[in-house]
Every structure is written in C-alpha cells, then in structure tokens.
Amino acid sequence: MTKYLFSDFDNTLRNSKVKNSLRIDQKDLDFIKEFQKNNKLIVSTGRPYKQLKEHLLNEYNLMPDYFIVNTGAMICDNKGRILYKKTIDNKIKIQLLNFLKTIVNQIDVIVFATSENESFLFHKNWSKDVEKFFFGLEKLNKTLDYLYDKDLLCLKIECSQETWNKIEDFINKNNLEVNITFNSINNRLFNEIHAFKVSKGQAIKGLQEKLDISSDDIIVAGDDYNDISMFEMFYKNSYMCKHKHNENIRNKARYLIDNIWEIKY
C-alpha cells in the first residue's frame, strides 16, 4: 500500500546536524527520494507554498506531492492547485486590525499570508540573514490599512511577550474565534493567528478524506508545538525529531528519532 509521509520542514525535513547549516542532510534527502518512488511526500509547514516549493526544487530537485502550508490553513498539490483553504473571518479580521493599529509601534514584524502569496507587511530589523531565512519573502513596508481588503490565511507577529499578552487579552475578552500558534525564531516570539480550528492535524484529516487514505498508511513527523495536532490525531505512526526545544513535549509522539531517515515504513 502507498504510504503518505506528512513531514514538517524546519528542524524535521531540514535538520542538518552541522552547526548553523540551513541544508537538508544528505542522508535525509536520499531517504525522502527513495520513499517517493512508491509513496507520497507531503510537507506540512508554517511556511508559504510559493517560496518553499521554489526552494525545494532549486536547492534539492525535490518536489513533494502535496503541500500543507501556513500551519494547516491551505493545502495545495505540486501544480499549485488549491485543494483546501480556511481564511480568517472578515469581521474578526477587522476587529484584530483595528486593535493592532493601536499598538503597532510595539510590534517589530508583521507577516501576512493570502492564498496567492505571503509577504512582510513591515519588518523593523531587516537584514540579509532575515531575507535568506525566509527564502526571499518580499518586504512591502505597508501599514495595516493594506490588509483590510485581503482574505487572510494568517497573521504572523513578532513582538515582546508583554505586547503579545495585550493581543491575546484582546482576543480573549472579545471572544474572537481564532487559532493561535506559538513560535519563536532566534529566541524572539513569532506567533501566528489563524482561522478557528486551523491546524496541521485538521488539514491532514481533510486531505485524508479527499484522497480516501487509511489512517494506517499515514506517517507524521515533526518537532515543535505546531506539530502536536499531527501527533495527537495520528499517534500510531508519529515521529518526533529530538531537539532541545521539544524536551517538554516528547511524550506527544510515539517514536523519538534524530533524523527522518530513521522512519520505518
């Protein structure tokens, strides 16, 4: 039977043990390409479709069969056809943007994603390293007004914990039905706001129904908090790549590994 591997990208598929390397380990790459000969690879990531697809093709001649992007807000095939998407409710979006405008001077970075693209709305600490890490994501230098007519898959916000607490308090006090994904990049808080009930696990469920895949044929691999929904819904064949940052959640996956080439199928 065909197996379907749903793998996170950062620190899972791209998980070099060479310090400061941003390359996929060759042994992992060989494993994936061998796996794809008779099975299906789905990259399940917080990153956007367009930039990740180009990166994998240009750097590794690797083409996943499907992409779950923006932490489960959208599913595409490798031709760019959208199979599923869930955008933030328009009324909720307007309430959020109105509030963010009142504290925008406390926010360092805002990234927004639509089904067409993902861009930095603004970035107050721009550098070539930032551009490289985000695969050349465009910086628009726009205000929040730019987003009012956009159908948003998600907002990603870099700010202090104090500022984030204000955002979360606003969401809770106004009973805004959204999903929050907690992240950090280079020890800076970088959280995501998605539509209600968006997660990688829910997206896998959606693709499973569309393609009529047995749960026995689904393998999930990840390393971080935004992968927990995958582990919970598909625990039987769940793998976690060990890192310092996931010591507190290692019980969420059935198997612990150092690299994805260790996955059994």
Curated annotation (Swiss-Prot):
Top-level taxon in the UniProt lineage: Bacteria
Coiled coil: none
Gene3D superfamilies to which the protein is assigned, alphabetical: HAD superfamily/HAD-like
Pfam family, one: Hydrolase_3
Gene Ontology MF annotations: magnesium ion binding; phosphatase activity
InterPro entries associated with the record: Cof, HAD-like_sf, HAD-SF_hydro_IIB, HAD_sf
SUPFAM superfamilies linked to this entry: HAD-like
Cellular component GO terms held in the UniProt record: cytosol
Protein name, per record: Uncharacterized protein MCAP_0867
